[in-house]
Amino acid sequence: MLPSLEHGEIPRNLQRLLARSQSDEPAMLPRRSFLKLAGSVGLALGAFPHLAMAQAASAGGAASALKPTQQPLAFVQIAPSGEVTVTVNRLEFGQGVQTALPMILAEELDADWSQVRSRHGSNDAAYVDPLFGIHLTGGSHSVKNSFTQYRELGARARAMLLSAAAARWNVDVATLRTRAGVVLGPGGRTLSYGELAEAAMALPVPEKVTLKDPKDFRIIGTPTTRIDAHAKSSGRQDFGIDTRLPGQLTAVVAHPPVFGARLTTVDDSAARAIKGVKAVLRVPVDRGGEGVAVVAEGYWPARQGRDALKLQWNTTPVEKADSERLLAQYRELAARPGRRQFDADMAPLATAPRKLEAEFVFPYLAHAPMEPLNCTVQLSDGRAELWVGSQCPGLDGTAAARALGLKPEQVKIHVQMAGGGFGRRFASTSDYVVEACAIAKAARAAGMKAPIRTLWSREDDIRGGYYRPMHLHRARIGFDQQGKVLAWDHVIVGQSITSGTVFGEFQVKNGIDATATEGMRDPYPLPMRLTVHHPTPNVPVLWWRSVGSTHTAYVMETLLDEIARATRQDPVAYRMRLFGDKHPRHRAALQLAVDKSGYGKKKLPAGHAWGVAVHESFDSVVAYVVEASVKEGRPQLHRVTAGVHCNLVVNPRTVEAQVQGAAVMGLSMCLAGSAITLKDGVVEQSNFGDFTVARITDTPAFDVHIVPSADPPTGMGEPGLPPLAPAFANAIARLTGKPLRQLPFKLT
């Protein structure tokens, strides 16, 4: 996903570019007609975001200064029954945002939590990130950036309900209170939110509201079962892949075996003969390549049709990337001068009493979400509707409009629940969305008017590109007998994720992509010279859960542990000394993990060892103390104790789940077979049989502990991943005496 960003870091021209697809076409119903329509579908407060500004203006104009993102009418529906539906402006793909954001709004609304439901937003202008001004689910920003927004939305809706009750009873609004979805008035009078919602919607939206004192929170901070838990655990939850429209067809694409290859011959006679196949279409695919789409009545005939195709490809004009050759090239690059991010004096390196040299290799990694990529497109005259689990509906809407020859406002995106993403559903090229649009356009040109769902198989997904980049690190470190680092000369070689994309303007500085170096040096006060090279092999790359920290945290935390071992220091005490007094959150997280794990006090079984790592990413700090062993040459992780500092916690259960999920994904990086490799341009892996992800038998016991804080929330979707692998590696190194300098682990 996107690395951590601060408000204002996205330049205005990028905001304008991404915002072009926001559907802000007003549906100008008269207010009376709108009220009638809202009532007819059982909704009262906030049914249609396009109408929020127009309705507020017709009610007196008091909210004219408010942005669409500040209008409760776009985010809150209250049915006559009192059921509250909160529209979530982020993609839910397992991180729990469809519970966390409604909790925030419901807190200030003073709603009855048992009556709260949630739904996704769209590419409407109301649902952009309130700080960045674009549609965005990434960078662990969801709760962090929308915390104040959703509090104010809830407070505004509550104020409108109070005003409606005051008008009905003809009393001073100051005499009223709310509790769990009910307005309480003088003399024991009560009105439910459902009874007041229609009247409240007709009132001006207050610009200024008073928010609760955090000591009065009754929902925020409470361990809460996720809204979607029952639907998911019972198999009732619909995802993008489950989209079913009347007359819908399914398309499966034969992609080039080498990225960017083009077709020379197509024999589709056998495919067309398969029952259920409706069309075979040549379509453009990512990186200038060509593919063949088989459109059929369902997935199985489409898949059979694709398997029956006889295709020949021209791979001569495109580079055929090869993992072994790339590693050799990376090693050559590492020895050359390059761009500098840090440039400390390296003179002390020559005279340092102790020295350490190391090389680290990190492979390409596939995102491999449980739900493969899919997108359903329905075209009509001058309009398009898309159903897709999109991390950036604005970006995807712009790309879809361009592919279809439409204006951005003619494209409507229905954001669907997604079964994981980890950054894959946020490609700057919108590759699979553009592909689905190209197929729908070609099918319509061939006389087919049915909606078409384009569906990737697991093999398509793993071989389809957009990987975590392969990286090579080299370090030369000089330190003294007390472990004080005197000079640290470091080189990183790896592809840039953002160069040449719309994100490059604010991510690439002095030729260095910040996503490749985030997590280096900080928070440790190290005299470092950091040199960076960005080669450009023909392999599409993308952010992968926790982005650069997937490799930088491993390098930093294992090398520091190695220095501690070399100077016979406890790794916890060594880190605490490096933190000094400047990093209280790091100290608190690490100390909490140490205290809860029994580190240094509890006797471990024979053949077991402790491992420690701590890392900050996306403004949150996670420290791990792990217990590991080696059995028959195979590393085993037994227990993980986490200390987490993410400031104020909205839902402790979500934080715990995110830490566990991220840690398991970090564990996957360590396991044999968890690498994407290429041979003569072809990806060698295809499914979970040859691309390893952690199974339940690999998963350790978890104890997750959170440092109490009242400061505004920080991100938690990704920070649990980076420190897991180095903590595991440090434990194994203490057992074997040998550092592990590549992922996945290789002990021999």
What spans do the regions from the language model cover?
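Conserved beta-alpha junction segments in alpha/beta enzyme cores
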Residues: 57-100, 104, 237, 351-404, ...
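N-terminal amphipathic, basic-rich helices that act as targeting or association modules
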Residues: 39, 154-159, 163-311, 627-628, ...
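N-terminal secretory signal peptides
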Residues: 1-29
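N-terminal secretory signal peptides and thylakoid transit peptides that target proteins
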Residues: 22-42
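Short beta-strand elements
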Residues: 74-78, 237, 374-379, 472-481, ...
